[in-house]
């Protein structure tokens, strides 16, 4: 008990110090990682284009239809009215139905309203259709669940609708469709969806390489294990496994599968992977540092990775990293969710280099934020070396769920960081 009190005091002091460190400093692997991301130029959606490029009611988008909600149904309490003064609701039925929606839909719509006013001063977001209680849409429409809205701009300038669709996607809607020249259709996942909040994890069956030369499932890691990772210069090293920032043994989650010609890695939408832009014809090895310096690898959410991007994999000899082109990205359900943290902040998982961090797209920021935890665990190991040098089962503090330190960082991050730096599927819902 005394040791845990000491650890928490050290972490608190260290965290305050970490807040004073300039966030722009880079400590990611290689020169290209950890640099501040340039402003992203937004491209309007074309007419009839939808994003992501999968059907609306699939896991990769808004998910399956769960049944119509009526005013008399038990699920009616899932809907909440939206009285945002920056949004115009057409409400042609004069019932207020268009204002009713799920909380997730409301959050994304409110975020979009801000983006619209920033993009076009004097223009507001306009909702033409929200929750439908009258049966005006096709069968199994997500409008019947309050999970979909049809939108325009208040000036009804159709030349803006392509950019409006892009802004909706950036605001976090799970599926956006330039459905009609008269409106944009947007929808979200169900509140209880397995993919609604994914956190940042790997499945329990994902493997890591230990210093002893064996590979084990990530779920079997113990404090004291040294796992294959990469240091700040891009060299492969064996790094101390510290703990799991999230650990759920039986939960089923949706994972993005990033597949190259030889390797495949599974990770949740909000987890960070080191990615380079498409570079045709270069799927060979080479010096890791020169790769970063010339090709611009950076941390990226798994949900943003596309075919043609490049990732870093362990070469055949197991001595270094090579770049490999992503051939396919798809979704897969798997059991277990584990977020291991190493001393270096990186981990080679299924022979692909990944960050240990998630939710915030800047690896270097996350690594600095976790510095107090690394220092605190180091001090604790000095007083109790047996806790961190044996292969005994994890201590009671390593129970299931999200680690308290990670929860604190997430809450602080939502207060001090801009919304577009935090993944909309960031913190996993707590296990029940």
Swiss-Prot record:
Zn(2+) binds at residues 143, 150, 185. Keywords: Autocatalytic cleavage, Calcium, Cell membrane, Developmental protein, Endoplasmic reticulum, Golgi apparatus, Hydrolase, Lipoprotein, Membrane, Metal-binding, Palmitate, Protease, Signal, Transferase, Zinc. A motif (Cardin-Weintraub) lies at residues 35-41. The record marks 246 as: Involved in cholesterol transfer. The keyword Calcium applies. One of its GO terms (cellular component) is endoplasmic reticulum membrane. Ca(2+) 1 binds at residues 92-93, 98, 128-129. GO terms for molecular function: calcium ion binding; cholesterol-protein transferase activity; patched binding; peptidase activity. Ca(2+) 2 binds at residues 93, 129, 132, 134. It comes from the Eukaryota. Transmembrane segments: none annotated. The record marks 271 as: Essential for auto-cleavage. A lipid is attached at residue 27 (N-palmitoyl cysteine). Residues 1-26 form the signal peptide. The record marks 268 as: Involved in auto-cleavage. Pfam families: HH_signal, Hint. GO terms for biological process: animal organ development; cell development; cell fate specification; cell-cell signaling; central nervous system development; intein-mediated protein splicing; neuron differentiation; pattern specification process. Its EC number is 3.1.-.-. A lipid is attached at residue 200 (Cholesterol glycine ester). The keyword Ribonucleoprotein does not apply. The record marks 200-201 as: Cleavage. Induction: Activated by activin, basic fibroblast growth factor (BFGF) and fork head. Belongs to the hedgehog family. Interacts with HHATL/GUP1 which negatively regulates HHAT-mediated palmitoylation of the SHH N-terminus. Interacts with BOC and CDON. Interacts with HHIP. Interacts with DISP1 via its cholesterol anchor. Interacts with SCUBE2. This is Sonic hedgehog protein. It comes from Cynops pyrrhogaster (Japanese fire-bellied newt).
């Amino acid at each position: 008990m005394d040791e845990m009190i000491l650890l928490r005091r050290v972490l608190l002091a260290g965290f305050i110090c970490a807040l004073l460190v300039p966030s722009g400093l880079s400590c990611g692997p290689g020169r290209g990682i950890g640099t501040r991301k340039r402003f992203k130029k937004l491209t309007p959606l074309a007419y009839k284009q939808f994003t992501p490029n999968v059907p609306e009611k699939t896991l990769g988008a808004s998910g399956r239809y769960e049944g119509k909600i009526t005013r008399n149904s038990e699920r009616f309490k899932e809907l909440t009215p939206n009285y945002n003064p920056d949004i115009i609701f057409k409400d042609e039925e004069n019932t207020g139905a268009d204002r009713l929606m799920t909380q997730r839909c409301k959050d994304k719509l409110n975020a979009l309203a801000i983006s619209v006013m920033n993009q076009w001063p004097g223009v507001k977001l306009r909702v033409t259709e929200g929750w439908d209680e009258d049966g005006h849409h096709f069968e199994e429409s997500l409008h019947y669940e309050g999970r979909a809205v049809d939108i325009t701009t208040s000036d009804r300038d159709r030349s803006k609708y392509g950019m409006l669709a892009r802004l909706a996607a950036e605001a976090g809607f799970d599926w956006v469709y330039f459905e009609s020249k008269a409106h944009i259709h947007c929808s979200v996942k169900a509140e209880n969806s397995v993919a609604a909040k994914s956190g940042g994890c790997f499945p329990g069956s994902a493997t890591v390489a230990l210093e002893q030369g064996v590979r084990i499932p990530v779920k079997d890691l113990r404090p004291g294990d040294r796992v294959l990772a990469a240091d700040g210069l891009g060299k492969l090293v064996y790094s101390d496994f510290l703990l799991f920032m999230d650990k759920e043994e039986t939960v089923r989650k949706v994972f993005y599968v990033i597949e190259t010609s030889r390797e495949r890695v599974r990770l949740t939408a909000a987890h960070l992977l080191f990615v380079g832009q498409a570079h045709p014809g270069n799927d060979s090895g080479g010096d890791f540092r020169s790769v970063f310096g010339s090709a611009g690898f950076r941390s990226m959410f798994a949900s943003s990775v596309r075919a043609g991007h490049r990732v870093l994999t362990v070469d055949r000899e197991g001595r270094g990293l090579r770049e490999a082109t992503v051939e396919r990205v798809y979704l897969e359900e798997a059991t277990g969710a584990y977020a291991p943290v190493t001393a270096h902040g990186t981990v080679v998982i299924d022979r692909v280099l990944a960050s240990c961090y998630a939710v915030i797209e800047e690896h270097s920021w996350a690594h600095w934020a976790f510095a107090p935890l690394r220092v605190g665990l180091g001090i604790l190991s000095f007083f109790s070396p047996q806790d961190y040098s044996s292969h005994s089962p994890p201590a009671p503090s390593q129970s299931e769920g999200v680690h308290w330190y990670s929860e604190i960082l997430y809450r602080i991050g939502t207060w001090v960081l801009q919304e577009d730096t935090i993944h909309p599927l960031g913190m996993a819902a707590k296990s029940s």
